[in-house]
Curated annotation (Swiss-Prot):
Belongs to the PTH family. This is Peptidyl-tRNA hydrolase. The record marks N9 as: Discriminates between blocked and unblocked aminoacyl-tRNA. TRNA binds at Y14, Y66, N68. The active site is at H19 (proton acceptor). It comes from Coprothermobacter proteolyticus (strain ATCC 35245 / DSM 5265 / OCM 4 / BT). InterPro entries: Pept_tRNA_hydro, Pept_tRNA_hydro_CS, Pept_tRNA_hydro_sf. HAMAP family: Pept_tRNA_hydro_bact. Its EC number is 3.1.1.29. It catalyses: an N-acyl-L-alpha-aminoacyl-tRNA + H2O = an N-acyl-L-amino acid + a tRNA + H(+). One of its GO terms (cellular component) is cytoplasm.
Length: 192
C-alpha cells in the first residue's frame, strides 16, 4: 500500500503558495486517476484508490493540520506495511529542480520534521520540489507563503505535472528505483 502525502497548508489564502507545492502535485495526480473515493479522516482529506486485482488500497493525503503539524495526520493514517511518500517544497533546490531520496534528516523542513517526530523514524520516501531561496534570510517566511512569479509558476507546474506522471507509474508498478531515477534526472527547464 502506498500512502502518498502532499505537504501544504489548508485554506484558500495558501492554495497558490510555494509552500503548497505538495498539494499542487496531488491536485494534478488526482486528474490522472479514476475511481478515487474521498473521505475525511485523521485530520486529512484522504482519497482512496482501490486496486481490485491486487486487493490493495492506496491513499492520497492532504493533511489539514497545517504544515508544521503534518506528523499528527500522517501518524493517524500510517501503518508499517505502507510505503510512505511525502511531497514537499525545498528552499535549497533551484526552482523546479526535483529530487527523491529515502530517509535522512528533515533538512530544516518543519513539515518533514513533524512527520519524523510523530512516526519515530525517518525511513520514508521524500519527493522534493525546488522553490529556490529568497535573497535575505528574513524574507523566508514571506517567500514560502508567497505566490511564485508567472515564469516561476510555469516551471513549478511542469515539475509538479512530471512528478504526478511518475506517481501514476509508481502506483502501477511499485518500482521505487525507476521512480527515483526518473525524478532525479528531470529538468523542468528543458522538458516541456
Amino acid at each position: 500500500m502506498l500512502l502518498i502525502v502532499g505537504l501544504g497548508n489548508p485554506g484558500i489564502e495558501y492554495e497558490k503558495t510555494r509552500h503548497n507545492i505538495g498539494w499542487w502535485v496531488l491536485d494534478l495526480l488526482r486528474t490522472k486517476l479514476t475511481g478515487l473515493n474521498l473521505r475525511l479522516l485523521c485530520y486529512s482529506r484522504v482519497y482512496e484508490l482501490k486496486h481490485e486485482l491486487k486487493k490493495e488500497v492506496d491513499f492520497i493525503v492532504y493533511p489539514l493540520t497545517y504544515m508544521n503539524n503534518s506528523g499528527k495526520a500522517v501518524k493517524c493514517l500510517y501503518e508499517p506495511r505502507m510505503d510512505l511518500v511525502v511531497i514537499h517544497d525545498d528552499l535549497d533546490l533551484t526552482v523546479g529542480k526535483t529530487r527523491v531520496r529515502f530517509g535522512g534528516s528533515s533538512a530544516g523542513h518543519k513539515g518533514v520534521s513533524s512527520i519524523i517526530d510523530a512516526l519515530g523514524t525517518d525511513s520514508f520516501w521524500r519527493v522534493k520540489v525546488g522553490i529556490g531561496r529568497p535573497f535575505s534570510k528574513q524574507e523566508v517566511i514571506n517567500y514560502v507563503l508567497g505566490e511564485p512569479q508567472k515564469n516561476e509558476k510555469e516551471v513549478l507546474i511542469r515539475a509538479a505535472d512530471y512528478i504526478a506522471d511518475q506517481l501514476c507509474l509508481l502506483i502501477t508498478d511499485r518500482n521505487f528505483s525507476r521512480f527515483q531515477q526518473n525524478i532525479n534526472s528531470f529538468n523542468s527547464n528543458e522538458n516541456n
